[in-house]
């Protein structure tokens, strides 16, 4: 079983003659897209060994697009959060299918994936604003790679592929962006601005707990214990195809209990009284959702609209514009800077593990080291 190698353009490929099939015809197996002959030889050796061990999987004629849309997306729907499935679907239909969806799944190579990623970096943006570049960011392209790697790994597990071409692909490394947060003075200015706003207590809740947008919008009064000063995060609101749906928290640790400070408890009591007055005023037009954060008629607040309101308040307060999610980062940065143990901050944020907290907010750690050095020295030296 001799392999033949040849360079075509900038890539190497190999082919091997197979035994005659049931139709009596000779068949040929080929693979391409390798950057070096050595890579092609290694891939050939794997195919040769699989053929000898009778473990070779005949390449499927299914296209990449058909596999992702007709098989993979429906199969994983039940095992992932609705918001995640919606995100996957948008990436598949927006980025993958239009560019490499017509390629045969079994013929997909690392080289083709690398070319696909390069194409997205140059001209991948679907909806381009006046000041936006045509290409996607390295971070977004890497998200596409992560999706493809997972989908192709499932294809291998299900017997559609012999190996995962994404294992050897080289997605771009995302640039480390500087985290945008408000300092304590800016946080106070924002809270002063929204203090008289109808949703002022909700903004205060976000600022003093670091809860995610979906967690706050999905919070029910049944999950709030004002007497005990605690709330339980058991569900979240996500936007899927312009519809607000109820989902599980983002991670297992996302299902958690959060202690509230007296000021936030007092603000929520006042807000609940306001909501009850609105219920009486609207009468039969009131919608009893049981939610804490609602519109005046009791209905749920659209997450995108909630973010837009946040931006409006930030502009009105003449504050640096940050995303609503950065309010969560601002809380975490303030808490860590104040010397709150990272484990406690991680638990309040609902991170899957403390390593995520330490990695995300590593910019705060040097100052914490200095504070620790001074405090320990004062304890030991008594000065």
Residue ranges and their predicted role:
Residues 2-7:
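Short amphipathic beta-strand and strand-loop transition segments with alternating hydrophobic
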Residues 8-13, 17-115, 271-292, 296-299, ...:
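N-terminal DNA-binding module of tyrosine recombinases/phage integrases
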Residues 125-130, 134, 191-200, 209, ...:
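Short, basic (Lys/Arg/His-rich) helix/loop patches that form interaction surfaces
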Residues 104, 166-168, 228-233, 323, ...:
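Short functional hotspots where side chains directly engage DNA or cofactors
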Residues 1, 192, 228, 237-264, ...:
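C-terminal secondary-structure termini that scaffold catalytic or DNA-interacting sites
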Residues 126-146, 157-221, 226-227, 238-239, ...:
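Basic, Lys/Arg- and aromatic-enriched nucleic-acid-binding interface segment
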Residues 18, 60, 73-165, 176-177, ...:
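N-terminal core-binding DNA-recognition domain of tyrosine site-specific recombinases/integrases
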């Amino acid at each position: 079983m001799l392999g033949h190698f040849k360079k075509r353009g900038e890539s190497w490929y190999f082919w091997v003659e197979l035994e005659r099939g049931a139709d009596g015809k000779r068949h040929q197996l080929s693979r391409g897209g390798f950057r070096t002959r050595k890579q092609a030889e290694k891939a050939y050796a794997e195919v040769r060994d699989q053929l000898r061990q009778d473990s070779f999987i005949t390449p499927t004629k299914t296209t990449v697009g058909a596999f992702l849309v007709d098989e993979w997306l429906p199969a994983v729907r039940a095992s992932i959060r609705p918001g995640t499935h919606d995100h996957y679907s948008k990436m598949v239909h927006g980025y993958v299918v239009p560019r490499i969806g017509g390629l045969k799944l079994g013929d997909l190579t690392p080289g083709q994936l690398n070319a696909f990623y390069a194409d997205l970096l140059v001209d991948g943006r679907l909806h381009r604003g006046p000041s936006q570049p045509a290409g996607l960011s390295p971070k977004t392209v890497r998200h596409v790679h992560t999706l493809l790697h997972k989908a192709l790994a499932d294809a291998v597990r299900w017997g559609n592929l012999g190996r995962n071409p994404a294992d050897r692909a080289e997605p771009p490394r995302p640039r480390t962006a500087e985290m945008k947060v408000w300092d304590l003075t800016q946080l106070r200015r924002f809270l002063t601005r929204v203090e008289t706003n109808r949703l002022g207590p909700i903004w205060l809740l976000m600022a003093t707990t670091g809860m995610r947008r979906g967690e706050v919008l999905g919070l029910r009064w049944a999950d709030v214990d004002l007497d005990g000063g605690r709330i339980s995060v058991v569900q979240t609101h996500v936007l899927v195809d312009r519809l607000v749906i109820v989902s599980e928290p983002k991670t297992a640790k996302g299902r958690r209990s959060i202690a509230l400070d007296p000021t936030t408890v007092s603000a929520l009591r006042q807000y609940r009284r306001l909501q009850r007055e609105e219920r009486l005023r609207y009468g039969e037009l009131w919608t009893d959702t049981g939610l804490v954060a609602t519109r005046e008629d009791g209905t749920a607040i659209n997450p995108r609209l909630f973010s837009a309101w946040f931006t409006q308040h930030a502009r009105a307060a003449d504050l640096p514009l940050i995303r609503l999610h950065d309010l969560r980062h601002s809380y975490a940065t303030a808490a860590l800077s104040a010397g709150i143990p990272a484990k406690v901050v991680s638990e309040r944020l609902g991170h899957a593990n403390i390593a995520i907290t330490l990695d995300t907010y590593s910019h705060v750690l040097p100052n914490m080291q200095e504070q620790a050095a001074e405090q320990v020295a004062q304890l030991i030296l008594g000065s």
